[in-house]
A protein has these predicted regions:
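Aromatic "clamp/platform" in nucleotide-sugar-dependent glycosyltransferases that forms part
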Residues: 292
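Nucleotide-sugar donor phosphate/pyrophosphate-binding loop at the beta->alpha transition
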Residues: 127-151, 162
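Short hydrophobic beta-strand element within catalytic cores of glycosyltransferases
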Residues: 309-312
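Conserved acidic donor-binding segment of nucleotide-sugar-dependent glycosyltransferases
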Residues: 324-335
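Conserved donor-binding/catalytic core segment of Leloir-type glycosyltransferases
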Residues: 13, 156, 199, 205-221, ...
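A short, active-site helix/loop in glycosyltransferases that binds the activated sugar's phosphate group
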Residues: 151-176, 181-188
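Short alpha-helical donor nucleotide-sugar binding micro-motif in glycosyltransferases
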Residues: 271-272, 279-284
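Nucleotide-activated donor-binding/catalytic signature segment of Leloir-type glycosyltransferases, i.e.
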Residues: 254-272
Length: 336
């Protein structure tokens, strides 16, 4: 192996078995691709194994030199994907795993252990955000399997809160390694007049006060409560609301918008390719985050990057991201 920056070039793997909105191809600033880019630019050869629903098409994409992402259909139980280890390269020098509370990781760990490949977990949360019976069962399965692996191996925590959560679960050696934005895919050098041009293109007026939200339309993201909040401020100024996302509450959200006659004030974009996401932030005045259990909040970081003021419910992620930042606000409740 040739020398790269004082170290050796290595073949590294990144595994993400989450079958949900995490790392959705082409639509979000992907954490696994951001990590992959950082490693590849150190001279390492990186393969990302990203689990997808079996209904989707398998695809291998060369992101850039030394970085490939392999979208692999996986059997899954909810958001928990099952990685078939036959796809893993036995020549890997290490496998980074976006683990969280994924329950189907023990067999991957055993595969690595047999080949003496270091298994490094990357954790944002170690408990289910749901409180129903199914989630309690999943938490129990996690504790019986994956958590035991975390207790014996290197673990990276995305936030100080994640590190503390892991410590309380008996994982004493987690090291904080914050998630960052993949700057390679962020828009740079935006002209000063672009905001007004984009507003016109998207059907908004120059004097509109545009609020935006980017999230999966699921209960924990609280899109229905976002409409309640919008109704409170509607009419005080020329407020408009942009919501980017889809999910199980999409139909109910659309019905609530119709019921309250907000079709002209609220615009929903179910899917926005990531190369176009900068337009949403650029033409908006404020970004609203309603999730009371936000673990990290990539969209919050993106909004800050594009100089869009953020108002977020105080939670683990926003409390770190927005700490001591002027022009942004952490709120204790919706009324603020």
């Amino acid at each position: 192996m040739r020398k790269m920056g004082g170290g050796k070039q290595m073949k590294l793997g990144i595994l993400c078995t989450m079958i949900n909105g995490f790392g959705r191809r082409g639509y979000y600033n992907s954490q696994e691709i951001g990590l992959g880019r950082a490693l590849a630019r150190k001279g390492h050869e990186v393969m990302i194994y990203k689990g997808i629903d079996p209904s989707e098409k398998e695809e291998k994409v060369q992101v850039e030199k030394n970085l490939t992402i392999w979208y692999l259909p996986m059997k899954h139980l909810g958001a928990h994907g099952f990685m078939d280890c036959k796809y893993l390269d036995p020549q890997l020098k290490a496998l980074f795993c976006f683990g969280d509370q994924q329950i189907f990781l023990p067999h991957v760990y055993r595969w690595c252990r047999r080949r003496r490949i270091p298994f490094v977990a990357y954790v944002g949360t170690a408990h289910s955000l749901d409180s129903n019976f199914k989630s309690k069962v999943m938490n129990a399965l996690f504790a019986a399997g994956t958590l035991r692996i975390y207790k014996k191996n290197p673990v990276l925590a995305k936030t100080s809160a994640a590190k503390e959560e892991l410590r309380q679960l008996g994982v004493p050696h987690a090291v904080i390694a914050p998630v960052g934005l993949d700057t390679a895919v962020l828009k740079k050098n935006i002209p000063a007049d672009e905001k007004m041009r984009l507003r016109k293109e998207h059907g908004f007026e120059a004097d509109d006060v545009i609020l935006c939200n980017v999230s999966r339309l699921s209960w924990e993201k609280r899109p229905l409560e976002l409409i309640d909040l919008f109704l409170q401020v509607k009419g005080k100024k020329k407020f408009k609301l942009i919501i980017v996302g889809n999910g199980p509450l999409e139909e109910e959200l659309n019905e609530k918008i119709r019921k309250n006659g907000l079709e002209k004030e609220v615009k929903i974009y179910p899917n926005v390719p990531y190369e176009k996401m900068w337009e949403i932030y650029e033409m908006s005045d404020y970004y609203l985050n309603m999730n009371k259990g936000e673990i990290f909040g990539m969209a919050i970081m993106e909004a800050v990057y594009y100089k869009t003021s953020v108002a977020a419910i105080r939670a683990l992620g926003p409390s770190v991201t927005l700490k001591d930042m002027k022009g942004h606000k952490l709120c204790e409740n919706d009324d603020e």
